[in-house]
Amino acid sequence: MEASDQSQAKLTLSFGGIQHAFSVPIEDLSALQDQKDAFLRSRSQASLSETREPCSPAELMLDYLEFLSCRNLPPPLTKPVLLAFSRNFLHNTEIHSLLAKPEYTPQTRRRLVRTYYMAALSAAESHVKESALLDAARQGNFQLAAVFGGQSTANPACVRELAELFAAYTPFLGDLISTAAPTLSALCRLPETKEHFCGRHIDIETWLHDPASIPDGDFIATAPVSCPVVGLLNLAHYAVTCHVLGKTPGELRSHLQGVTGHSQGIVAAVAISLSDSWESFYEAARMTVETLFWIGFECHQRSPRTSVSLDQVQDSLQNGHGRPSCMLSIVGLSRAHIQDILLKLNRSLPEDEQVYLALDNARDSFVVAGPSCSLVHLHTYLRSLKADASIDQTRIPHSLRKPTVQHQFLPISVPFHTPYLQEAARAIKERLFPWRVVSGKLTIPVYDNRTGNDLRKSDNVNLIHTMVDSICWEPCSWPAALGIENISHIVAFGSGGVGELAMRLKDGQGVRVIIGSEFQSRDEEIGTKADLFSPTLLASSTIVGSWGERFRPRLSKSPTGEVKIETKLSRLLDTPPLMVAGMTPTTAAWDFVSAITNAGYHVELAGGGYYDMDAMAVAVKKLVASIPPGRGITCNVIYASPQTLSGQVTLLRRLSSQGLPIDGLTIGAGIPSLEVVSEYIQALGLRHISLKPGSITAIREVIEIAKAHPDFPIILQWTGGRGGGHHSFEDFHAPILRTYGALRRCSNIILVAGSGFGGSEDTYPYLSGTWSAQYGLPAMPFDGILLGSRIMVAKEAHTSPAAKRLITEASGVSDSDWEKTYQEATGGVITVVSEMGQPIHKIATRGVLFWAEMDKTIFSLPRTKRVPELLKRRDYIIKRLNADFAKPWFGQNSKGEPVDLSEMTYIEVLRRLVALMYVSHQSRWIDPSYMTLLMDVSVRILERFSIVDELDDALVLREPHRFVENIVRLCPPAAHDILSPEDVAWFLLRCKARGQKPVNFIPALDDDFETFFKKDSLWQSEDVDALIDQDAGRCCILHGPVAAQYSQDRDEPAKEILDGITQSWIDMIRHDFYPGGVTPSSDSGSLSSESWSVLTPDLTSRDESALLDIIPEMQAYCPSISSLGRSGSPWIHALLSDEFILQGRDRRPNPCRRVFHFGPGGSLQFDRAKSEITVSMENHAGNRSVMRIVCENGADISVDLQQPSAYTDEMVSLPLKFQYDPGMVPVGISEVMEGRNERIKSFYSKVWFGEDICRGMNARSVFHGSEMALTEAMHRDLLSTVSLAYPHSETALSGVDVFPISVGMFPVWDAMARPLVVNDIDGDLLRLVHESNTFEYCEASTPLRVGDVVSSTAAVRAVYIEDAGKHVVVEASIERSGKPVMKVVSTFLFKGVFNDWNSTFKTNKEPELVLDVQSDLDELVLRDREWLLLHDPSQSLVGCSLLFRLETQVTWKNRNTYRSLDVSGLVFLQQASDDLKEIGAVAFHAGECVGNPVLSFLQRKGSPATSPTPLTSPGWPGVSSLEVQLPTSNEMYTRTSRDYNPIHVSPLFSQWADLPGTITQGMYTSAISAAVLEHLALNGDRRRFRRFSARFTDMVLPGDRLLVNVKHVGSIQGRMLFNVSAFKQATNNMVLEAEAELEQPPTAFFFTGQGSQKPNMGMDLYNSSPVAKAIWDEADKYIFETYGWSILDIVKNNPKTLTIHFRGKHGRKIRANYLSMENKTVTPDGQIVKKPILPGLTDQTQSYTFTEPSGLLFFSTFAQPSIVVMEKATFEDMRSKGLIPQSAVFAGHSLGEYGALLAFSGFMSVRNLVDLVFYRGLSMQFAMERDERGETNFGMVAASPQRVGKSDAVFTESHLRSLVQMISIASHELLEMVNLNIENEQYVCAGTDTETQLLLEEMSTTEDRTTTKLYKLILKSIPATKKLPMPIRLQRGRCTIPIPGIDVPFHSSYLRSTVSSYRKILQQYISEEDVHLERLVGRWIPNVTAKPFMADEGYVREVFNITQSPILKEMLEL
C-alpha cells in the first residue's frame, strides 16, 4: 500500500539521529502510536550496556518490531509493522542481504534475524523469496554442489556456534534439536559411556536455551562431544537454509549436483543425499549424530595415550602454536617434503609412536596425526627448519632460504585418519550395526573424501562402514573430494573454514564458493548467505570463469584484416602484449625507443640514463615528435634514487601539463607508498602506472595500491631474480604461485612477466598460463611479456658492436642454474652489488669480475675498515684499475707512472683530464660537463698563481690539448708545482659536483672510493670508443643470465625480433584455442583508464550500449542521448567515448565528450538525416549557449560553438574543425589546427568588443580605450557586486564617492584586452589564464571619484615563454584631465607549449638601484664598464651615491638566450638634500647573449633604492580575516566589468575549455579581497588605498566559500605594506595572494626644540640602527675635525667642562674656524661692531674652555647641534624603515624647526646645519653680557594659566599676557610671552631672572584678577625681588616650570638686533636650488604663522605682517 492510500496513516520512528516513517492502517495507528511512545521511552531509559544505538532505519524498525513481539501483543497489531518493514526494506531483497552490511555486528544480525522470523511466523506471513541462485541452478545455468565441514580449529566453539544459530533461527531448528538432543543425551548416559562423561553429559537443549551453561571449550573439543555436535551443526545450517527458502530437504537437494564432506563431514553429506522429506531428514539426522557420537567416543577411548611435559605445553602455547594434541596442521611445505620429514622422524620412533600424513587439504597444506609426544618432536623440528619471522630473507637467494612454514596443533583429541584407530573402527561398526546405508539409497552423488569416487558406485554393502573407515584410519584427500567435474558453485555448510578450504583448492578453476553459514566473507569472491537467499543475482553469486579462460590471450581481426592478440595489456596499450623494459642505458636512447614504438610495440624510456633534466626533456620531446601522433610514451624511473626521481617526476609533470602524451610511469627499485603513488597518478595525468615488486611483500603492497585506485590501471611487472640488471633474490615462479589469486581479484592489475625471455617458445606458456601446470595448479596466464636483455643486441640498439659481441658470446643458463651467478660467473654472467646496494646482473667482463672481487674483499667490509684495506692493497688495486676497469686510476705523472693526486703537478692534472674525458681519435668530449670541469680546474690554476686572463671557451671545445698548452704558456710554474693540499681537497670535491656527469676515473682511495668506482658505470657499453684502448672487456654490460641464451643475432632489427615472437604467438593461440581456424573480428579499440575495467577478455566488438554507460545520468532528462548512442556512426562513437583528441602532436582531453556530460538545463537533438548534433545549455541568467556538430562525410567534423552577444541580438559563433580517422590509433579524432587560433581570436574580439579583430594592430601598438565617465550608477553597481560576497552586504558599501581601487580595470579593459586578440601574439584564448593584476595610483594623484572623466591607453610590455606557456604583460594608464592617475598591469598566460621565440620581447622599467662608490677601487671598477657614459669623466665619484634609473629591452632566441639586449637609462648623483643630479647615462646593446651584465653588475654591487622593511611581528591587531561566499553566478560582475569571456557565464564553454565550472573572474576575486582589506584595515576609508597587486593561484567557482586573511607585514616609503591571501574553505587551497600599500592615517611629525635634550638621547638607536649611527658618526667626525669636540661625548657623558686645544696644525685650523665666526652688534650710535663669537679668543689663544654646571648638554652651544643631529638620525632611521608618509605634515618647535626642515625638505646638508645651529647657539650664548660667573641674568619659564588660582576661577591667556606686560612695565625690565604652545595650558616666557621670579611668585599666589589690584601687588613685590641674592635659582612652582640650561631670552625682542646678521648667515648656508617648494607647500607648518606653508602672495603678506621682514617687504613691493 502507498502512503497516499486513504486507509493508511504515517507512523514515524525517531531515535538517536535515525528517523523513519512508514504506513500502517488507520485503525491500528492509535495503538501503534502508544506502543511507539512506550518503545522510545524504554530505549531512552535503557543504559548503554543494555541497548545499542540503531545504525539504520531498518534496524530501528526491527527494534520496534522486537519490542512489540516481547509485549505479547496480538498478532494483528504486529503484522502491520512487519508488512511495512517488508514493503520498505525487502522489496528487491531479503533479510540476510539487508543485514550483510558491515555496520551490523554478528550479535545484532542474529537478534534482528530472530526478530524478523519470529514476527513473520507469528503473523502467519510468508517470508519466503525465490532464490536467484537456485533458480539459475534449476534452469541449468548454474551447477551446484554442497560440502560439509569436519573437525577443525573451531571445535571448542562448536556448541556456542550452534547456540547462536539456534538463537537466530529458533522456529526453524526446534524439530531438529528435539530429534538429536535426546539421542545424544541417552547415548552419553549408557553404562559403557557414563563413566567417561562422569556427569558432564551432552545436554544440547539445556545448552541452547541457557548458553551460560555451556561447558568449557576443552571439554567441548574432545571427540565424544565435538564429533556429534559438529555433525548436528552441519545439518542445522542445512535445515535453516531449507526453511528460509521454503523448501523441503529433498527440494533443496534437487538443486545439487553432488555433495561431499571434509573428514567427518562426509556423514552429513550422506545424510543429505538420503533426505527427500523432513521426516527422512530427521531420521538421517538421528543416524548422523549417533554415528558421529560413537566415532568420537570409541576413537577417543582407543587413541594412543602419551604425555607431554608442562614445559613443552607452555612453550607451544606461548609461541602461538596451540596446546599439543594428536593432530598438527602444517602449511607451507610440499607433500614430498613432509613425507620425507615423516620418514626420517619415524625412523627414530617406536612403531606405536609414529606419525602419519592424515589429511591432504591443498598443495601445501596438510595435517599430520599421531601421539602428541611425537607431534611435539615434529613441531620442534619444524621450528628449527622454518624461517624466523623476524628475519628478513628477501636478500637471501630463494633456494637458500628457510621455508616459511605455519604449523598449529589442532584442538582434536584423537589422531583421525591414522592406523591407530583401526581397532576403534571395528568397534564403531559393531556399535552401529542397527544402521545400514546402501549405495542405492543415495539420490545424488556423494563423493568419497579419500578418492573422489561417487559412493553410489561403491561396492560396500553398508556405506556406514565406508564412512567409519574414511574418518578413523584412512587418509583424507580434500583435493580428491573436490575433484567434482562440471560444477560452477560450491555451497559450504558448517564451521571450521571448510569454505575457505574449498576456495583455496578451487581458486582459478572457475568455481564460485558460497559459504552458506556466514553473513560476511573475508574474500570478495566468496559468497555468503546473502548470495544463497537473495531474490536477485548478486555479483558474488555469478559464475566466475577459470583463470585460464578469463585471462588467456585471444585473437581478433581488425577492419584491415590484421590479426591481433588481445589481452588486458594489449587493450590498455593498443599494442601487442609484448613490451620492452626500461633499461639503462639501452632504452635511454630516444631514437631506439622511437624505433620500437614505431614498430608498434610498447617500450619504456629509461630515466636512469639521465642525470640532467634538460637533457631528458629534450629526449622526451624528440621521442614524441618521432612517433605517430597520439601515441603515448612511458618513462621508467628509479625509486631508489630519490633526488633524480624527484627531478624527473617534476619534469614529467611539466611536460604532461604542456600536452605531451606522458601515458605511463614505471617505477623500479622499490615500491612507493600509497600516498606517493596517488600523487603521481593525480599530478602527472597518467593513463597507467607500472610497479616492479621484488618480493611477495612488495607484491602485496602493489595490491593495496591497486585496491586504493580500483579504476586506475596498475601494471605489475614481475621479473624475479633472474632478470638482467638490478634484480631481486626471488625465484621467478614461487611468489606468483602464492599471490596469483590475490592479484587477479584486483581487476585493475595488469600482470606482466619479464626476465629470462627471448623467444616465442619460452614465453608462450606464460602468456597462455600453462606454465603453472607443472606445479599442479590451474592455468595462470600473464597479460603480457616483458623483454629486456634480448633487445640489447637489436640492430638499432646503441650497444657498441664490441659489447654486442661479448653479449652474444655469453652462453646463458637455464632457470634452475641462474642463482650460481651470486658466487661466480655462470653462463657468462655474474651478480655484483650496484651503487644502490642492490644485486645486479652483468656480463662477466674483466672489469665486472674485478668489481665482483672488490665486492667480496673491500665493499663487504664495515665502512670504517675499508680505507685501511684499500691502502694496504693500493698497488694491486691501482694496477687492476688501469689494466681492467672502465674507470682507471686518475693519478699519473708525465712519465705515465701511477701516482697520487697530491703528487701531480697542475698541468699533469689538466693533461690527465683531457686524456680521460676527451676522445681524441674522434675529436669529441664524452660529455659537455667534462669540458666544464676542465675549465673550472683551469680557472682554479690561474687563480692559484694570480694570473688574470680570459680563457678561450671555444678552444676547450675544439682543441683541448692546445688549450692546456696555452695554460702552460700563461702560467709556467703550473707545470712543475704540485697541487697544494687545498687544491687536492677542492679537486676531489669538484669531482663530486651535482649536475655533472660523474667522473670516469678513480681520483683517490678514500671513503668515497665505492661511489667513484660504481657510480654511472653503464654508459661505456654504448661508447666503447671512450674506453682506454677501446677495450670492451673493461666495461659493464647489463644482461640476464637466462635471457643470455637467446641473445645470439647482433644484426636483427628490433621490429623483426618482436614481430617474430608475436606472429609465433598468434600461430600457437590459433592452434590451441581456435581449432576451427576462425578468428573473430574486432574494432574494440584501445582501452582507456576509465572504461577498461568494464571490458572483459571476451569482448571482441564495441558494444554500443557501453556508450550510454559513459553518461547514464543524462538519460533521465535527455532521452535523445539514446538515439545518439544507437546511431552506429563511428565518428559519433569516437566523439562520445574517446578520452583524447589530437592537436598537432599534442594529446588533449576530448572536449566534445565533456560537453556531452551536461546536466539539467541542457538539451540534445540528433538529426540523423543531416548527421547533425545540437547541444544547448542554459546558464543561471537564462542565456543559452549552443554547440552544433555536423559530419556529412563521416570524416570531416565541424563544431560550431555559439554564445549570445552583449552588443547585438545575434549569436557569436566559434567555428572549430576536426577530422575522424578510424585507422589512427589510439586517438581517432584530430583537430584541424590551421587557422584555429585566428578563428578563436575573431570570436573573442566579437564577444569582448562587439567587432572583429582590427587587422592594423599588433603587439607593439598602443591601444586606446574610449573615454569613460565614472558615474554614480557605476559606483553603485561595483559596490553592489562586491557586496554580494559578504555575509552582511553593508560591509562593502560606503557613503563616500571614492571608487574602490579595483575600478581601475573598468576604464582600461577595452584597451588592455585588445592585445590578446592581435594575430602576432599566437595563443589559444580558450586556454587563457589571467595570472595577476596590479592597480597603483600615480604619485600625488588623488583617488578616482564619481564624476571623474577618464581615458586610457595600453601597451604590451612583455611577451615571453616559460614552461607554463606564453605570458603576455599589458600595462595600461588611466588619465584624468590629461594627467596620469593610475597604472594597471595585468599578466595573462596562454597555456601550452610555444616555440615562436621571434615574437617574444620585454620592455621593463627596472627598479631604481643605488651604488655607493666607497673607494678608489670601486670607482675604477665602475669606470671600467663600457656601458657607463659620464657627462664629466674627470669628476671623482668616491664617496658618492649613484642612482641608476634604467629600462631594459630584450628579445629571446630561446629559453636561456637573448636574441638582443638593450639597457638604457640615466645616472644620478644623490645629493645631501636628497636632490638628484644627472651625471651620466647607461647605454648597452648586445646581440645574442645570456644574462644581463648591466643589471647583474649593479645588483651585485648596489642595492635597491627603495625596499620594504618587514615587521618583526607581522599581523594585525584587529580582526584579520573575513569569510566571504561568491555569488552562485558571475553574471553581475561580467556585466559590470564588461569581461564577456564565455567561460565565466556559459557552462558549455567552460566544459569545452576543460574547466570545473563557470570559473569566477580573477578580477572579481581581487575586488572582493581588496574590499576585505578596506573593511578590516581602513575601516572603509579607501582614499588611503594606493596599490593592490594580486596573483591568482587557483580557480574559484561560483558559490565557493573563501577565507580572506590580511596581515600587516611591513612598510615601504611611508606606506603600510599588507599581504592579503584568500583560501577555499573546502580545500584550504590558496586562490589569491596579494600585496597592498596603504597610506598611514593622516600623520604630523613634530620636532622638539631646546629643553628637550637629555643625556644618552638617541644612543639606543645609535647602537641598533646602522642608518642612525652613520649620521651620528658623520656629524661627530665633522664637528671634531672642524670644532675640536665630540658630539657623541657631549650626548653620552654630558661633561661639565670641555677644553678645546689649539696646538698643532689641526688645532690651529680649529682656532681659525672659531675666529671666523663673528657677532655683529649695533652700538647706540648706530655703528656695527664685529666681535669674535668666543669672547677673548685671539690668534694666540692655546685653548678654550666651556663650562656649564648642569653639563654642557644643557649649554645652548652644544645642546642645539645635539638635538638637531639626534632628530635627523631618528628621522632617517624611520625613513629607512618606510615609516615616513610622503604626504605627512611637519613642524618644529623653536630649534626643532631646523630639524624638521632638514628632515623633510633637505634644504641643507647635515654638516651645514651643524655649522648653522652651532653658530646659532654660540651667537645666542655669547651675545648676552655675562658676569664674572658667566651668568646672563636671563632665563625662560613655562607657565600654565589653568593652574592659577582656585578651580572655579578662570585665568586665561589674556590674563597671563596682561600679567607679563604689567610686570615688564612696572619693573622696566624684559619679560615677554615668547612661545604659545598649548592654548590656556602652556606658554613660555623669557626675561630677566628677577622678572621671571616675580612672574613665578605672582602666578602662584594671586587670587584677584582685577588689573588695578594686581598691578599694585606687582609694584609692591618688585623691591623684594630685586634684593634677592644673585644668581636667582628659579624653582618649580604650581603654575610655572623653569627651563633648565637656558640663560638666553630666545624669541624675545631682546635678540631682535641679531636678526639681520643671522639672516645673512642663513643666506650663506641656504641656496635657492636647495629649497624645494613641493616639499614645503601644504606640509610645513612654520612657528611664525602656525598655518601650512603656501607659496602665494596672501601667505607672504601674512608673514610680513607678523615679522616686518624687509626682504618680504621688498618682495611685496611695499
Swiss-Prot record:
Tell me its applications: As colorants, MonAzPs are widely used in various food products for centuries. Moreover, MonAzPs also possess wide-ranging biological activities such as antibacterial activity, preventing hypertension, lowering cholesterol levels, causing hypolipidemic effects, and displaying antiobesity and antitumor activities.
Which parts of the sequence are annotated with region: Malonyl/palmitoyl transferase (MT/PT) domain? Answer: 1645-2005
> What's a single GO CC term here?
fatty acid synthase complex
Q: Which InterPro entries match?
A: Ac_transferase_dom_sf, Acyl_transferase_dom, Acyl_Trfase/lysoPLipase, Aldolase_TIM, FAS1-like_DH_region, Fas1/AflB-like, Fas1/AflB-like_central, FAS1_N
Q: Where is this region: Dehydratase (DH) domain?
A: 1126-1606
BP terms from Gene Ontology: fatty acid biosynthetic process
UniProt region (Enoyl reductase (ER) domain), positions on chain: 570-815
Location of the MaoC-like domain: 1514-1627
**PANTHER family from the xrefs?**
FATTY ACID SYNTHASE SUBUNIT BETA, MALONYL COA-ACYL CARRIER PROTEIN TRANSACYLASE
Name the protein family: Belongs to the fungal fatty acid synthetase subunit beta family.
Q: What is this protein called?
A: Fatty acid synthase beta subunit pigK
